[in-house]
Structure formats: C-alpha cells, structure tokens
Amino acid sequence: MFRTVNGEDYSPAVQQRNILDFGKAHSLLWTDNGSANDRCETGGNCRESGQDRVKRPMNAFIVWSRDQRRKVALENPQMQNSEISKRLGYDWKMLTEAEKQPFFEEAQRLRAMHRDKYPGYKYRPRRKAKEATEIASRRLFSTVQPNAHRGDVVSLPIQGRLRQGHTFTNGKPVKPLTAHEHKQLTPATGASQQLDKPAPQ
C-alpha cells in the first residue's frame, strides 16, 4: 500500500497549500493522535495532577514541522528524534519569510480559535522535576537549620545535583571527610575537629 511520490509533492508551495487546506477543513484544533493529552483540546476528559490541562496553541514552527517531522522520519527511520529536531530547526531557519508566512497565518488562526474556545486560558508551564527537587531540598534545609546550635552537625538527605556526602554546620557546607579523617571519628561523639572547617570555595 505504497504510493509513488515525485519531488514536487514536497515542494514548499504544495506543502503550504496542503496544510492550509487541511486547517480550513477541520474546525477542531489539530492533534497528532487520539491520546489522552490530545483530548484536552477536543473537549474530552483530560486530567493531569487533578486539574484540567489545556494545551497551548501551536506556533508557526510547530505547524510547519508536524508534516516535515513525519516526512524526515519516514525517509530516515534510523534517525533519532533529537537529530530530527535539529534538522527541522535548521531547515526552518533556511526558509524565507515568504515561505514561512502561511504558517504564521495558520498559527494566528489557531490562536484566535483557542482564545475563543478557552477565554480564560493562561499558560502555566509544568515545573521540571529538577526544580521541584531543589525547592524541596531548600525547604528541608530551612526547617532544620533554625534548630541547629553552634557546632552541631546537621546531615540532610541530599538529592539531585547537590554533592552527595556533604554535611552542613551552621548553614555552611563542610568538606567531605577523607578516609584518614573518617578513621579519626570517635564513636562517642561521632564528630571530629575536621567538621568545623568550612569547605574550600
């Protein structure tokens, strides 16, 4: 079930005409497939983190790149998605303003439809996992730090990109113990004089 395609089918003029015809023929915002996230745009049930989530309208690059991504993926099945994205970004930059104009117009039309369908919509980006971890670490430190007395060692469960094994004394990082220093720890106190030295900056 393959069809023979000539090079003219992928010319910018034919692609622009096909995209504009498709957009005018469909009253709903475009979606790639019927996945759960896409049902947000078409009025279906969509729950994420206990709240309804409405996707942003597509910009001109996304409108253009949808068909281009499929074409590149079919021509190069071994190519990674990240490589396809780089190639599409480069190809988009190489287009002239006249070639991009229909996609900007289509994106503007989609924004207007989105504004009419969701009048109170406000873009709220999802917090990245790394940010959430760092915020949680800061909150934990701020709750433990006031209870620490001068000279007390406060060990925190450190996550993310912070260095493992670091402890804090009075809010300042302390250099990690070497193997020799670790042997000098006394079982009764669990601390050594080395812990009072601040970490080198």
From Swiss-Prot:
Q: Which family does it belong to?
A: Belongs to the SRY family.
Pfam families recorded for this chain? HMG_box (PF00505)
Regions of biased composition (Polar residues) lie at: 186-195
What keywords tag this UniProt record?
Activator, Calmodulin-binding, Cytoplasm, Differentiation, DNA-binding, Nucleus, Repressor, Sexual differentiation, Transcription, Transcription regulation
The job of this chain, per UniProt, is described as: Transcriptional regulator that controls a genetic switch in male development. It is necessary and sufficient for initiating male sex determination by directing the development of supporting cell precursors (pre-Sertoli cells) as Sertoli rather than granulosa cells. Involved in different aspects of gene regulation including promoter activation or repression. Binds to the DNA consensus sequence 5'-[AT]AACAA[AT]-3'. SRY HMG box recognizes DNA by partial intercalation in the minor groove and promotes DNA bending. Also involved in pre-mRNA splicing.
UniProt subunit comment: Interacts with CALM, EP300, HDAC3, KPNB1, ZNF208 isoform KRAB-O, PARP1, SLC9A3R2 and WT1. The interaction with EP300 modulates its DNA-binding activity. The interaction with KPNB1 is sensitive to dissociation by Ran in the GTP-bound form. Interaction with PARP1 impaired its DNA-binding activity.
| Chief place where the protein resides | nucleus
InterPro entries xrefs: HMG_box_dom, HMG_box_dom_sf, SRY, SRY-related_HMG-box_TF-like
Region described as Disordered: spans on this chain: 164-201
User: Which subcellular locations apply to this protein?
Assistant: Nucleus speckle; Cytoplasm; Nucleus
GO MF terms, alphabetically ordered: calmodulin binding; DNA-binding transcription activator activity, RNA polymerase II-specific; RNA polymerase II cis-regulatory region sequence-specific DNA binding
**What ranges are recorded for DNA binding?**
54-122
- Domain of life, per lineage: Eukaryota
Q: Name one GO biological process term.
A: male sex determination
Spell out the GO cellular component terms annotated for this protein, sorted alphabetically and separated by semicolons.
Answer: cytoplasm; nuclear speck; nucleus
Among CDD domains, the record links this protein to:
HMG-box_SoxA_SRY
**Gene3D superfamilies referenced in this protein's UniProt entry, alphabetically:** High mobility group box domain
Name of this protein: Sex-determining region Y protein
